[in-house]
Amino acid sequence: FNMESDSFEDFWKGEDLSNYSYSSALPPFLLDASPCEPESLEINKYFVVIIYALVFLLSLLGNSLVILVILYSRVGRSVTDVYLLNLALADLLFALTLPIWAASKVNGWIFGTFLCKVVSLLKEVNFYSGILLLACISVDRYLAIVHATRTLTQKRYLVKFICLSIWGLSLLLALPVLLFRRTIYPSNVSPVCYEDMGNNTANWRMLLRILPQSFGFIVPLLIMLFCYGFTLRTLFKAHMGQKHRAMRVIFAVVLIFLLCWLPYNLVLLADTLMRTQVIQETCERRNHINQALDATEILGILHSCLNPLIYAFIGQKFCHGLLKILAIHGLISKDSLPKDSRPSFVGSSSGHT
């Protein structure tokens, strides 16, 4: 394909983009190989809309409660609480964009270029900041449990600097989306929100494909496996009273992370290898990859509403904190509060939850 001899809009002619929405996958019109006729065995768009709506409601409720409980527990707030606060905020911001993405599944992108840039930016920032914060939590628990180091991690200014750095790095990594996203109006199909990078669109998009796979999955995953691996080893050797509970939380963190993001990133890796000619591309493989990307992306979206369940609802401290808030506002009796409840719903930065 020669971008210099054809205009960007001409390149969209004849393509079936009526059901295309935001994805890091490359759409069928950017294939370097011979054109393939896309199969119609795609995920029902109304089913996807229902999933988006459920994730939106669960994420909005769960992450709002997490933020509320952490903000109320100022006295006993731990380092892990600060990370969880930022994680919940990132997931909440992403959840607010889901109704727009759901509407675009049905009607195409009808919201203009400004919202195209804004909601795409929020989705990218959530992707990067969320996983980077998960990695920071694993490092914090590793230092506290394996090395019994709390002096460094308990310095408030350092924790704030780390969180601000994560948000800054996430914005930097998402900057290309803000710069190059716009509403595209193909002929005879619904408009889409996608990148327009001029003559080098295909090459730039391949570069941007590598960024989320590296910074957004591989590196944080290696950090989490390393930290949680040594943390579990230490817990097995030490006879701590809350060892089994800590192990359950850690296993839940790693397991849910892998279940949500590993399938999508494996398919994304296969797609990248195919587009770089490492794996021979056929029409059958291309259609299978496109269908797998659509299906596994839903798992990644589900992760935003599962985080409150992993980090909060599994532990008793969150429930205690929520009960305290209800008691303060007179919604329940103070007699129902546990006597040994603590303000921080994760206990301490050690991760013994």
From Swiss-Prot:
Residues 73-81, 140-160, 229-248, 313-353 are cytoplasmic. It is a multi-pass membrane protein. It holds the Pfam family 7tm_1. Coiled coil: none annotated. Glycans are attached at N19. Disulfide bonds join C116-C193. GO terms for cellular component: external side of plasma membrane. Phosphorylated upon ligand binding; which is required for desensitization. GO terms for molecular function: C-C chemokine binding; C-C chemokine receptor activity; C-X-C chemokine receptor activity; interleukin-8 binding. It is found in: Cell membrane. The chain crosses the membrane at residues 46-72, 82-102, 118-139, 161-180, 206-228, 249-270, 292-312. Keywords: Cell membrane, Chemotaxis, Disulfide bond, G-protein coupled receptor, Glycoprotein, Membrane, Phosphoprotein, Receptor, Transducer, Transmembrane, Transmembrane helix. PROSITE patterns: G_PROTEIN_RECEP_F1_1, G_PROTEIN_RECEP_F1_2. GO terms for biological process: calcium-mediated signaling; immune response; neutrophil chemotaxis; positive regulation of cytosolic calcium ion concentration. The keyword Mitochondrion does not apply. Residues 1-45, 103-117, 181-205, 271-291 are extracellular. Receptor for interleukin-8 which is a powerful neutrophil chemotactic factor. Binding of IL-8 to the receptor causes activation of neutrophils. This response is mediated via a G-protein that activates a phosphatidylinositol-calcium second messenger system. Binds to IL-8 with high affinity. Also binds with high affinity to CXCL3, GRO/MGSA and NAP-2. Interacts with IL8. Interacts with GNAI2. Belongs to the G-protein coupled receptor 1 family. This is C-X-C chemokine receptor type 2. It comes from Gorilla gorilla gorilla.
